[in-house]
Amino acid sequence: TMQNRVLMKYRDNLEKGEAIAAIVPDRVFRNEDLDARHEHTFYQVEGVYVSRRVNVGNLIATLQEFLQEYYGKKLDVRVNPFYFPFTEPSFEFALSCPFCEGKNPDCKVCSGEGWIELLGCGMIHPNVLRAAQIDPNGYTGFAFGCGIDRLVMMKYGIEDVRHFESGKLDFLEQF
């Protein structure tokens, strides 16, 4: 994750009475089994927001507003508890599968579950704030990370994330 580097870079904002609010894109490489939802190389965007009295409600409302704005409509979103080492509590946001709406047990995108994990998020762990020399007794914040490829996949009905790296011009030229 990039959040500690971002927190260090912008922590002076807090001394000026301003929040830390940053969105950072990056290229990610992972050792993953490849399928319609997973690729070993992809683009990710991470976001952090730190200020006084930031809470889980702020996190969920911010992400729901972003998703509604990006997709242009209110979405059926599921927020589940999850584990990420740098946030506590942590959550996983999932969207209702736009390809089968949970009605196809053979759906390659949601595996018949009806939901597609879209992003991970949570409240920044106090130890992460301390490592960035931010007092966790005075400040709280949230962080999230989302694959850009998956955002685009869901928006444009692309059933296989591997198309992005395929180099096929007929696929790429439609955008």
Task: Place the predicted regions along the sequence by residue.
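TRNA-recognition modules of translation machinery and tRNA-sensing kinases, especially anticodon-binding
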Residues: 1-175
